[in-house]
Amino acid sequence: MSDSRASSLRALLFASSAAGMLVAAPAFAADVTADDGVIATADQQQPANLGTIDVNGQVRKPAPHSPEYVAPLVDTPRSVTVIPQAIIEQTGADSLQDILRNSPGITFGAGEGGQPLADRPFIRGQSSGNNIFVDGIRDTGGQQREVFNLEQVEVIKGADSVYSGRGSGGGSINLASKSPKLTPFTSVSAGIGTDDYLRGTIDANMPLGETAALRINLMGASGDVAGRNAVDYDKWGVAASFAVGLGTDSTIVASYYHLDSNQMPDYGIPLYTKLGGATAPRPDASGVLNVSRDAFYGLKARDYLNNTVDSFTFDWTHRFSEALTVRNVSRFSTTLNDYIVTNPGDGGSAQQIGGVWWMKRGTKTRWNPAQTLANVTDVFGKISTGGIKHSYDLGLELTREVNRNASYSTFSTSGSACPAPLTGFDCTPVFDPNPADPWTGVINRSAPSRSITETVGLYAFDSISLTDRFLLNLGVRWDSYQTQGVSINSTQTNGVWTINPLIPATPTGTPGVVALPKREWDFVNYQAGLVFKPTDYSSLYVSYATASTPPLIAGGDQNTAGTGQGSGNLANDILEPEDTETYEVGAKANLFNERLSVGLSAYRLTRKNAQLLVDAGPPATYAQVGEVEVKGVELSVSGNITPAWQVFGGYTHMDSELVRGASNSVNVGESLANTPKNSASLFTTYRVLPRLTLGGGVYYVSRSNGGNQGGAGGGTNRIYAPEYTRVDAYAAYDLTDTASLRLNVKNAGDERYIMRTNGVHHADPAPGRAATLTLNLRF
């Protein structure tokens, strides 16, 4: 990290601490004492329990924020995990991937497909990058998300189009933002650590009268990635929300969020295929090339990644009575995912010259701004009809998304010269890459393609109390999903892009600009669940749910400027959405005076209707008959076993299979990519002394196949990430009732493991051991 950047972050940390104390000075909150004896500041998450302490010192169990959840979690016949702010803070998380490590069964895909160099979670083996929401509204565009403004993260698993509309079928993730409260408080954190780690945050909540409040969150951070040469980051963010009518029947919340993140992008290390293709010697069974963990193939003089986000939200809620509440949320957001990154798997096969393996650096590039305008209306409440109780929600969702995509040319004019017979520049030894190699050249951006997507969704939910012990949970949703794209036919020579004038002008009237036809899909999805309650705090359930994935997002990532048409004999046909269904049975219980929540479920997920080559011909014949299946068991635990002992985690077993693949596919019968058979996590803390808490996390993931089917990554040549076990350590010491120190040691054993691989180009090594020390002040 540069000295100037380190100096600026140190100044930010000092300013954060000073500003936080100044903001807090006139508005100290009275301390309240929770039932477990832990000193707590009103409305703040506490290290010793996973609920929220209200102004009366009572623990409120974490629950999803959306009115679509018409029943408490214990009575919801679905696998739903709520990761509260306490876990986010205690684990030292600063990314969505850090948070979701605590929810087994979720993996992250490598940088390929529709969301390269962006969050690409896989839930129950299904790519779910398009199924990330913020406060119930889909968060579009490629991003690597921050956590400083999060109150909790909510994960629903299984086919969930009833909740989310179009989706991948594996589940969805909702990020719940911090919101204004009527209790004054300020939280300030300042952290330092190994690998030039610096991070500072301020969370200030200021009541403005009896029913209004302003909440401001600030974040600045920088550092290097442990164990990865030259990989660093620098980011800052601000979130501000203003609320009026708090504690009354009518509330308005207006909020703004901004994030600016700059980093050196990392595409990991090559696979064995770099040294001669699929038939090359394979020294390691995984297929990952045995190079140093810190081997970095990018160029500091050329590569970069910038993410920016701006989001404006207006939320109005009015409660007419217990039977009727109306909520309307509008949002306008823009995101930009902009990068040039070296892909060690591109650039052709390496060559052995003079006893040294040499390779050319290939590049991946993207300029991807996205814009979203959304409005969601919910009408919800509780009513009784004929002695039967209903908890219902009716909703309307309207969205318009504009997604543009372009790439960069990176024509090198000088730099690291290639030895003969390789020619040109951008060469490096495979086993000794130097990110400080010089580079100069021409960088130009191509004309962008564009897609405009408009959706309308109508939905209804009802939790029906048939008796004191039996509940029926129903949901239905209709969606209209339509999109139209514009593509640009262009070529680049020596770094200069030229629109191809030979393409006839289309209705756009511009040569080379091709307006693709508007495509529209309508689909209806359902869920139904029956719940039996042996006690007030436990339940047994069985449920069924469906999901639909239009062909333009069949990869589970983002909308594309495509046609939605098939291949070969289906070239003139508009493909139908892929269909997913989930059957699930389970049990839930709140134990120990509702301090601890546990859940156990078993499920079968089936995804059908993917386009496949069924006869190689000639002529080649395609049909929508592809099918995958995932069967699994999940165990979850969250809360306090004793007032001093906190646990959060679970175990997932997934038995996945490609049931039907392409003609003569060698992958049929194999487990799916990014779907490890076993995964488990447990983060636990214990208050060993009145002011000292110790703990840590253990994370296990079994072998996970690479992210692509077929080719070098499929069949007998399957690339995979080997199993690993990672251990984190945690300690916290209360200096005073309002000040504490927190020590996090991530990957304490310095385990060398592969987080993920796309199975064709590269594999991503996990960061090495990293330690951080954070001072937390709460007023």
Set out the residue ranges of the language-model regions.
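Acidic, small-polar-rich N-terminal luminal/periplasmic segments of exported/outer-membrane proteins
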Residues: 17, 43-183, 585
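Structural signature of Gram-negative outer-membrane beta-barrels, strongest in the C-terminal barrel
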Residues: 243-245, 370, 389-393, 397-401, ...
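Face-selective signature of the C-terminal outer-membrane beta-barrel domain
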Residues: 312-333, 363-490
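Membrane-embedded beta-barrel scaffold of Gram-negative outer-membrane proteins
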Residues: 317-321, 325-331, 335-341, 541, ...
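C-terminal beta-signal and adjacent terminal beta-strands/loops
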Residues: 642, 700-710, 732-779
